[in-house]
Amino acid sequence: MLILSGQGNPGAKYAKNRHNAGFLVIDRIHDAYGFGPWRTKFDAEISEGTVETANGRQRVLLIKPQTFYNETGRSVSKAVTFYKLQPEDVTVFHDEIDLAPGRLRVKRGGGHSGNNGARSMMAHLGENFRRIRIGVGHPGDKAMVMPHVLSDFHKVDLEWFEPMTEAVCKALPFLLAGDDERFQTEVMRLAPAPKHDPKQTARKGEA
């Protein structure tokens, strides 16, 4: 069993926010691979399914913590304990302001870089889980970071975000087989990041 978790906030108010990029990717994986119905457990919405990989068919648990973004570790750690898993069995998808819109990077270990969801995960699980960082760009002003990530994706964002979610689904077997580099390369090949300034989306406003 491997866990794929998204970071985000529960409720319709936040559903299309940049901060909910992780939830949106998990939803797309759920639909693309025909996972089972969502149910409530571990203070989260969870769904089980399988994905065919080079190493054989892999059981996967999808998790969307309902604890709000800054407490996601509390929910995921409950699932890890229940299934007797290790932090290395966990992959978390989350938005990343320090990456340009449309960029994706895989990270294992290291610091939380100010991401409170990652901070919560590390507090509960340590540093040895995998993070899939989805670039949403920086607004250019520290005071605007929260309004930026708690705003909905704009139309210009969807031009790269939707292809990226599709690419993540197609490349997912590489990730589940432990080939982080191949997964990252394949996603960026299938959905190249737009060639614009990292702050462009924020400047465009509601474009």
UniProtKB/Swiss-Prot annotation:
Q: By which gene is this protein encoded?
A: pth
Q: Which GO terms describe its cellular component?
A: cytoplasm
Q: Which PANTHER family match?
A: PEPTIDYL-TRNA HYDROLASE
Which GO biological process categories is it annotated with?
A: protein quality control for misfolded or incompletely synthesized proteins; rescue of stalled ribosome
Q: Which organism is it from?
A: Hyphomonas neptunium (strain ATCC 15444)
What NCBIfam families does UniProt report for this protein, alphabetically?
Answer: pth (TIGR00447)
> What this chain does, per the record?
Hydrolyzes ribosome-free peptidyl-tRNAs (with 1 or more amino acids incorporated), which drop off the ribosome during protein synthesis, or as a result of ribosome stalling.
Know the name of this protein? Peptidyl-tRNA hydrolase
What is the reaction catalyzed? an N-acyl-L-alpha-aminoacyl-tRNA + H2O = an N-acyl-L-amino acid + a tRNA + H(+)
Cite the CDD domains for this sequence: PTH (cd00462)
Q: Where is this site: Stabilizes the basic form of H active site to accept a proton?
A: 95
For this protein, the record's InterPro entries field holds: Pept_tRNA_hydro (IPR001328), Pept_tRNA_hydro_CS (IPR018171), Pept_tRNA_hydro_sf (IPR036416)
**PROSITE patterns, A to Z:** PEPT_TRNA_HYDROL_1
Localization of this protein: Cytoplasm
**Complexes and interactors:** Monomer.
